[in-house]
Amino acid sequence: MEIEKILGEMEGLWKKVIDKVIKSPKGNLSREEKYNLYAFTIIQLGRTSAQANLIQEAVNTRLCTIAKKHLEILRNSENSDKYKDITDDELNHISFNFPYPAVLALQTQFQLINTCIDLQFKILINKTKVSFITSNNPAAKYSQFLERMGVKNYALGSRGLQIFIPLTPFIGVMFYDPKCYKLGDRKKNYVELTQEKDIEELNKLTASNAEGVLYYLPGSISENQLEKLSGQNKYYKPQKRVEEYPEIPTADGVIVGSYHCSLFCKLSLSFVKELPRYRTLRKQDFNCREHLLREIAYIKDEIVRKTF
């Protein structure tokens, strides 16, 4: 398939920059290398079974809602007796078989690849004795700012977006909204993490985002710690991946829609500081039109054009 060919070409570029970061985490990256690291991280968000399952559930939820609405119309028709034995509860148990959700998830992610081009990143160097864990859904989205504001969900265009992905047990990368946060020293492209609490918090995020499978350095995690991480996944991972929007009535009927439920795990990181404009904002002063979304910047240059 064409998408597999594109992935094969890009994976070679991604491997080069990841190997360079692992070998020299404090070193500088070229503009193209920075973009390749960014592209790897963004594509990874849609390249997992978790995202495929999310797509499947989103399609199922939407089609189930449409089926209920169609049934409602049929019940009000002249032949309503034909449909009286069909209940909404029965429709809730119907599963619509959507072919190749993983392919659609990946295609969608490619279309969204430059949605987060305005984010900056820092290499996270773990200097503690506690190693990073990873999972079968390794790239985790978050927004500490929107969590503090009490907003129920976030997406790639949200204010305060953060994306964390561990590369090794002691090297990770975090992309972040530079208008909302400061990470470490502004003059450095890395942050040295010396507090075990920060590693535990990042591991909590990774565990909560996992799709049932964790990976860790042999001997680095005790059985009690594994049970704790498993408990965090069960507690913080949304029980439902997809929720329906309230119906919007129109002259031609109603508009129905759905949204993805976001992960919130009370993330607390000592090296992430909100900038004054947002740090001083209180929940009661939060305005969706002003504070919910970022001004997305699309860089129209040769590096970006190579990805299309």
Where does each model-flagged region fall?
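Alpha-helical structural context detector biased toward long hydrophobic helices
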Residues: 1-308
